UniProtKB/Swiss-Prot annotation:
Transit peptide: 1-40
Domain of life: Eukaryota
Membrane topology: Single-pass membrane protein
Protein encoded by which gene: AIM39
Residue ranges, annotated region (Disordered): 47-75
Polar residues bias spans: 48-65
Organism: Zygosaccharomyces rouxii (strain ATCC 2623 / CBS 732 / NBRC 1130 / NCYC 568 / NRRL Y-229)
Keywords: Membrane, Mitochondrion, Transit peptide, Transmembrane, Transmembrane helix
Protein name (Swiss-Prot/TrEMBL): Altered inheritance of mitochondria protein 39, mitochondrial
Family: Belongs to the AIM39 family.
Record's subcellular location: Mitochondrion membrane
Amino acid sequence: MQNGYSVSIQHYTAKTTAMKTLKIWRPIFQRWLGKKGPVDPRYVFSRPPNNKGQDGTHFFTNPQDDNGGDNSGAEGIGEAIAKQRRQKRTRFAYNLFWVSIAGVLGYSIGYKVIYKKEQSFLPLMPASRVHKLNDRDARRIGIDKIRVLSRLKVLEQLSQHEMIKEQYGVPLLNVNTHETPNVDELTVWCEDSDPCVTGLVLEPDDGRPTIHNWYRLPYVFKWRLTHRPINIHKTINDISQNLGLTLSDVFQIITPEKVYGSFKYEYPLTSDDHYTKIWFLGEMKLGDDSLIIYKGKFHRDVTLEQIHLLRRENGKLIRYILYKNE
């Protein structure tokens, strides 16, 4: 019995030792069988170390995203430098813009208005030469006066035209009412002779009465939006005066067109910033199918520029030029 029991124990011990040995050698055999190429004898019973270090060019990026080859690092550095330069230029332009605005406002408001107590003008954008008349200017000019004078001038010119005398007769009468035609529509506007800019007029807030509507910073300054012409000759003259020169002592520019009755000496609006030219456009009906349209300018008296007749004939609208000031 004892011999049989000893044999069983020895058999169990040998089996256990063989299983432990198999567990130790199994990963080695698997690595030998699965690895291609010769096996390094230094790492038969261990794993070879991983010598791959961190790539400095991909410290914050994934190396798999880099498909540019050896030049990818240099290209990335170049793009970063170019981006930084663009940001510096943008920042410089932005700072220069605000410094310029601060300088202009400081000179216009702080120096001219507050310190020297003078008027200052800040141009903002180009303005149209054509402007509508406000109520104050319309009352001062007298729209009714333009209506009466233009009607008399138009009737005088039409009564002398051969076509009007033959087809409508003299005195000229409305075909439907058999009365002298009246002005049905009249539009009046002003036009500047020089290019204009829209800007801000700044003045000290001294409490004086004024005809304009102002925005105020009490006891400091006031401002309003207006437009002013760009007179090159006046600008050069102002610059020369600041330098101690006077152009009128050397020469004087005389434009033959700018005489009485032309742009420069047209109807001047009192206390306004510049001279303007007053234009008007009127309509008079001669019948259901006939319409007189005339255009002219006003300076104490009416000067006609054009008179047209619009008439419907055979379903078509025909225009006749009856008068044109050459």
